[in-house]
């Protein structure tokens, strides 16, 4: 997958309950948003920091 492909994926919180704060790119708004990730499964549209999300997606 390319960065563009990952950034266009919808955020998936996954089925677990770890409640980890992450950032994901919202292709509809063109912004990275803070969301809660469950800690397992999900997809590549998940970044540890806002800066990582912006670097990968907001400027592609």
Swiss-Prot record:
> What are the record's GO terms for cellular component?
extracellular space
> At what residues does the UniProt record annotate the site feature described as Reactive bond for chymotrypsin?
17-18
Checking InterPro entries in the record gives: Kunitz_BPTI (IPR002223), Kunitz_BPTI_sf (IPR036880), TFPI/VKTCI-like (IPR050098)
Is the Disulfide bond keyword given for this protein? yes
Summed up, the tissue specificity of this protein is: Expressed by the venom duct.
Domain of life of the organism encoding this protein: Eukaryota
Q: Does the keyword Secreted apply?
A: yes
Q: Which UniProt keywords apply?
A: Disulfide bond, Protease inhibitor, Secreted, Serine protease inhibitor, Toxin
- List the CDD domains hit by this protein, alphabetically: Kunitz-type (cd00109)
Q: The BPTI/Kunitz inhibitor domain covers which part of the protein?
A: 7-57
Stored Gene3D superfamilies: Pancreatic trypsin inhibitor Kunitz domain
Q: Where in the cell is it found?
A: Secreted
Q: Which cysteines are joined by disulfide bonds?
A: 7-57, 16-40, 32-53
One of the entry's Gene Ontology molecular-function terms is: toxin activity
Xref: Pfam families: Kunitz_BPTI
Instruction: List the propeptide residues.
Output: 1-2
SUPFAM superfamilies cross-referenced by the UniProt entry: BPTI-like
Q: Which family does it belong to?
A: Belongs to the venom Kunitz-type family.
Domain comment as written in the entry: The cysteine framework is IX (C-C-C-C-C-C).
What protein does this entry describe?
Kunitz-type serine protease inhibitor conotoxin Cal9.1d
